[in-house]
Amino acid sequence: MQFAKRLEKIPPYLFAEINRKREALIAQGVDIINIGVGDPDKPTPAHILQAMREAIDEASNHNYPPYEGTQEFREAAVKWMERRFGVVDLNPNTEVVSSIGSKEAIHNTFLAFVEAGDYTLIPDPGYPVYRTSTIFAGGEPFTMPLKAENKFLPDLDLIPEEVARKAKMLWVNYPNNPTGALATLEFFEELVAFCQQHSILLCHDHAYSEMAYDGYKPPSVLQIPGAKDIAIEFHSLSKSYNMTGWRIGFAVGNAYAIQGLSQVKTNVDSGVFKAIQKAAIAAYNTDEVELQAVMSVYQNRRDIIVKGLQSLGWPIEPPKATLYVWVPVPPGYTSTEFTTLLLDKCGIVVPPGVGYGVSGEGYFRIALTICEERLHEAIQRMQDAGIRYS
């Protein structure tokens, strides 16, 4: 028995050593504070649970769902896109498809459009799935560095013309994981123009569209005139509605891109349980006041972490979106060295920035997914251990 050669190209799990040490410390009785995982700790809102309970009792929901999602779900997604972003004239029959979360749809889009010899343009640092899915599809990832001096936006001028000519897809994710960076409509206009010029499929991973603070509302790339000619956007209910385990979302945009994604999906999965789609419809009709109440919890946690780190000398500002704070490591450390120090000295688990790509070196990521008391305790442990930025 032998693994396929493609697995040899998949990088090893970069956090394996940290996980090994974490388990060893837990076995020794050490109280570990894990702020490394972007998995919301709050329950799914009650009205979504109620919609699920009612849908489970309907026998008509117990058989196979439509591959592309129920008509009701796709229409709800279209209405939400119009209500939330002002994106109109989306066709629920040809420009929307349900997905099992967004990770599945992201991966299957690579399989639909990338072949051997094709480039994919992916952000670095970025969601690791962009790179691994490129490799699974037989393509070649070309990384676009995200640098602080460019507000963690890719510089399109740095993409060589010979690479752009062979590129099939360009991936962006704003609000951004792991950096928390934002994109403006003006930047989206640049992306659309670049992808139109080079006949590249523009893919926007919008998993954090509702995870925003201080009154900020992240835009959709589909707000740009002409974007639907070359763009597809991926939405997920996982983070915004505390539904990571439910595995539900949708892809929306260019009809040809949706067709390609759907063709892969119909051959590898059987859709999303119809009762979960009913619950998702309830989620997309969540009252804005209730949604903002959820966001206020994460905003408060953000403020605890940012103020705490500032008190220890860190030169950081509060991010306006996502579940994360992207933090520079103190001078003299690599990201892996510093995250190992936090684990050994403080019992704090955070991922090193290099785990998200070589351009993530020099940073680590904090997830705002544990209670306020434990966040305060994490800062206190760092202070007690004498860990400061400078």
Swiss-Prot record:
Binding site for substrate: Y13, G38, K103, Y127, N177, R365
Molecular function in Gene Ontology: L,L-diaminopimelate aminotransferase activity; pyridoxal phosphate binding
Enzyme class: transferase
E.C. numbers: 2.6.1.83
Pathway(s) this gene product operates in, as recorded in its UniProt entry: Amino-acid biosynthesis; L-lysine biosynthesis via DAP pathway; LL-2,6-diaminopimelate from (S)-tetrahydrodipicolinate (aminotransferase route): step 1/1
GO biological process, one term: lysine biosynthetic process via diaminopimelate, diaminopimelate-aminotransferase pathway
Cofactor: pyridoxal 5'-phosphate
Pfam families attached to this UniProt entry: Aminotran_1_2
Residues with PTM N6-(pyridoxal phosphate)lysine: K239
Superkingdom as given in the UniProt entry: Bacteria
Keywords for the protein's UniProt record, in alphabetical order: Aminotransferase, Pyridoxal phosphate, Transferase
Catalytic reactions of this protein: (2S,6S)-2,6-diaminopimelate + 2-oxoglutarate = (S)-2,3,4,5-tetrahydrodipicolinate + L-glutamate + H2O + H(+)
Residues given in the record as pyridoxal 5'-phosphate binding sites: Y67, S102, K103, Y127, N177, Y208, S236, L237, S238, R247
Entry-linked InterPro entries: Aminotransferase_I/II_large, DapL/ALD1, LL-DAP_aminotransferase, NHTrfase_class1_PyrdxlP-BS, PyrdxlP-dep_Trfase, PyrdxlP-dep_Trfase_major, PyrdxlP-dep_Trfase_small
CDD domains for the chain: AAT_like
Physiological role: Involved in the synthesis of meso-diaminopimelate (m-DAP or DL-DAP), required for both lysine and peptidoglycan biosynthesis. Catalyzes the direct conversion of tetrahydrodipicolinate to LL-diaminopimelate.
PANTHER family: AMINO ACID AMINOTRANSFERASE, L-GLUTAMINE--4-(METHYLSULFANYL)-2-OXOBUTANOATE AMINOTRANSFERASE
Subunit structure: Homodimer.
Similarity annotation: Belongs to the class-I pyridoxal-phosphate-dependent aminotransferase family. LL-diaminopimelate aminotransferase subfamily.
Name recorded for this polypeptide: LL-diaminopimelate aminotransferase 2
Name of the gene: dapL2
